[in-house]
Regions:
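N-terminal targeting signals for export/organelle localization
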Residues: 1-47, 204-206
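Short loop/turn microsegments at loop-to-beta-strand junctions
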Residues: 41-42, 63-64, 164-166
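A short beta-strand-turn-helix
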Residues: 44-64
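Short active-site neighborhood of thiol/selenol oxidoreductases, capturing the structured segment around
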Residues: 57-84
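Structural microenvironment flanking redox-active thiols in thiol-disulfide oxidoreductases
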Residues: 81-145
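Structural micro-motif
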Residues: 132, 143, 147-156, 160-168
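Thiol-/selenol-based redox modules, centered on thioredoxin-like
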Residues: 156-206
């Protein structure tokens, strides 16, 4: 009994140290938990800014980020595209851009978003076409495609589009692994989502 009493303090100290260590490292453990497969990503073949056909499947083997927008958007699309430009920079700094990852910005509005318009728009955000494609299709086709990525969209009487501001993370095998919401301007402005998306893309790409 005396021996047990004599050793209880160092034993208790070890237990406390272990608990504190687990608490400190838990966020890192959560960070590296596997991302679940949510659903199979919808395939597409759309027109790029040079008139080329771009498909999701041609970039199998790369981690992909899919975003729906339109360049005449009066609010959230503009800061979100600026945010994607920073994601591009982050991926480049990690040697992931183009070789291991791709980003697609797909317009709801092919009537106004011509190839020339999309090219000028993309240049305004220093988009590197080797790893960030601005794409267009038919209005109805893109609407249906967006819905398959769980993005709802409604065309209003002014010709603008009311839509959810979501990103879909697609893995190398064509599975959607995560959906990010950027509907809150504060979230877009904070910079936290930029790092989160880049971190998740790196996790899948490595």
């Amino acid at each position: 009994m005396k021996a047990l009493t004599r050793h209880w303090f160092p034993i208790a100290l070890i237990v406390v140290v272990l608990i504190v260590t687990l608490l400190i490292w838990k966020p890192w453990g959560d960070r590296f938990e596997p991302l679940p497969i949510l659903w199979e990503a919808a395939q597409f073949e759309l027109e790029g800014t040079s008139g080329e056909t771009v498909s999701l499947s041609e970039h199998d083997g790369k981690v992909r980020l899919v975003y729906f927008f339109f360049s005449h958007c009066p609010d959230i699309c503009i800061p979100t595209t600026a945010m994607l430009s920073k994601v591009q920079d982050e991926l480049k700094s990690r040697d992931l851009f183009a070789d291991k990852t791709m980003m697609y910005s797909i317009t709801f509005d092919p009537e106004r978003d011509t190839r020339e318009r999309l090219l000028r728009f993309s240049e305004g955000y220093q988009a590197d076409a080797s790893g960030w494609k601005f794409l267009r299709g038919t209005e109805e086709g893109v609407k249906n495609l967006a819905q398959q990525y769980k993005v709802s969209v409604i065309k209003d009487q002014t010709g603008n589009f009311i839509h959810q501001n979501l990103f879909s993370l697609v893995d190398q095998e064509g599975n959607v692994r995560k959906v990010y919401s950027a509907g809150d301007p504060d979230v877009v402005a904070s910079g936290d989502l930029i790092k989160q998306m880049a971190d998740d893309m790196e996790r899948l790409a490595r």
